[in-house]
């Protein structure tokens, strides 16, 4: 095992966690370091000192030759200094509270480091920020190829696919609402909530009108019971996976309030979307559908600069439709 490390720390949704892990893995591979994942304090668990990775994913020893620490050894492991970014060289007690400005500063420092294709003298590089868009797609594919849901979760995914998807051309619809949280980059898509739902329904109709080799089945995955009611009222034959929702406008679905089952439900939907023939991403800024974006033959997105404009992305070409 290498004696220098990249530590990937996240407490957010699985899309962000895995995408950020891909960026950390690429740097670890390039600089001959061991990669460690620390998902303690995960939004999916009410146990702050439990590493969420082994709760939801199968144990692995390496990712394409990069040694990988992914269990609760991170609780006792003493990562060697010096550290990068420099913030982590402070006494541990002073690192407990990190203001948002510091997190964004570290994200930018890591971005510069990754883009420069250089290494640093630090023995441990700490990646504790959202690192979406900070690596190439092949790094993302490597993570999704290597990191597998636990066997019992995969069995649930397979069973649902066989019962509801097999023999159909599946259209997966992901609608990230936020349910009252600060949705940040997603906000422009929800400036007019009624229009947003109308746009989603328009996209579903557009997807159904495209050529399909088999009978079409539409599945909706959303974090909002309100959105579920609105969309299913217009498409009565819509398929949904039973799960618990939080009260209206009470915050994001990825919450410790729902326990481990909430995380399992999220993984089931994320991987089922990746098995669809067509996926609609609303908004396309959500990392939850990144796996589907990389694996599904046809993706329908909403233009970042003009959310009313649909973009149809095929594996070999890109077309637009208004």
From Swiss-Prot:
Gene Ontology process terms (BP): oligosaccharide biosynthetic process
Signal peptide boundaries: none
Domain of life: Bacteria
Residues annotated as domain GT23: 1-314
EC annotation from Swiss-Prot or TrEMBL: 2.4.1.-
Protein keywords: Glycosyltransferase, Nodulation, Plasmid, Transferase
Presence of the UniProt keyword Transferase in the record: yes
GO molecular function: hexosyltransferase activity
Matching Pfam families: NodZ
EC top class, as a word: transferase
UniProt cross-references to InterPro entries, sorted A to Z: GT23_dom, NodZ
Family affiliation: Belongs to the glycosyltransferase 23 family.
Function: Fucosyltransferase which adds the fucose moiety of the nod factor on its terminal reducing N-acetylglucosamine end. Uses GDP-fucose as the donor group.
UniProt name for this protein: Nodulation protein Z
Species whose genome carries this gene: Sinorhizobium fredii (strain NBRC 101917 / NGR234)
Classification lineage: Bacteria, Pseudomonadati, Pseudomonadota, Alphaproteobacteria, Hyphomicrobiales
């Amino acid at each position: 095992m290498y004696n220098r490390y990249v530590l990937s720390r996240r407490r957010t949704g699985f899309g962000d966690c895995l995408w950020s892990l891909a960026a950390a893995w690429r740097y670890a591979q390039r600089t001959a370091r061991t990669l460690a994942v620390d998902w303690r304090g995960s939004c999916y668990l009410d146990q702050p000192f439990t590493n969420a990775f082994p709760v939801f994913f199968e144990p692995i020893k390496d990712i394409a030759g990069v040694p990988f620490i992914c269990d609760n050894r991170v609780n006792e492991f003493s990562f060697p200094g010096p550290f990068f970014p420099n913030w982590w060289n402070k006494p541990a007690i002073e690192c407990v509270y990190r203001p948002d400005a510091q997190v964004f500063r570290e994200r930018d420092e890591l971005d510069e480091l990754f883009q420069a294709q250089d290494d640093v003298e630090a023995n441990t590089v700490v990646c504790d920020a959202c690192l979406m868009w900070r690596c190439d797609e092949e790094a993302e594919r490597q993570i999704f190829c290597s990191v597998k849901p636990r066997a019992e979760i995969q069995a649930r995914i397979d069973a649902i696919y066989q019962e509801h998807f097999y023999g159909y051309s599946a259209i997966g619809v992901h609608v990230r609402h936020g349910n009252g949280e600060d949705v940040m980059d997603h906000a422009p898509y929800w400036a007019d909530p009624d229009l947003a739902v109308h746009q989603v329904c328009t996209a579903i109709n557009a997807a159904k009108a495209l050529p399909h080799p088999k009978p079409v089945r539409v599945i909706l995955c959303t974090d909002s019971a309100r959105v579920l009611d609105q969309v299913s009222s217009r498409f009565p034959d819509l398929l949904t996976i039973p799960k618990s929702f939080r009260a209206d406008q009470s915050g994001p679905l990825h919450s410790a309030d729902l326990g481990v089952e909430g995380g399992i439900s999220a993984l089931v939907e994320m991987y089922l979307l990746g098995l669809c023939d067509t996926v609609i991403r609303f908004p396309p800024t959500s990392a939850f559908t990144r796996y589907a974006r990389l694996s599904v033959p046809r993706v329908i997105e909403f233009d970042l600069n003009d959310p009313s404009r649909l973009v149809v992305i095929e594996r070999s070409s890109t077309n637009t439709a208004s």
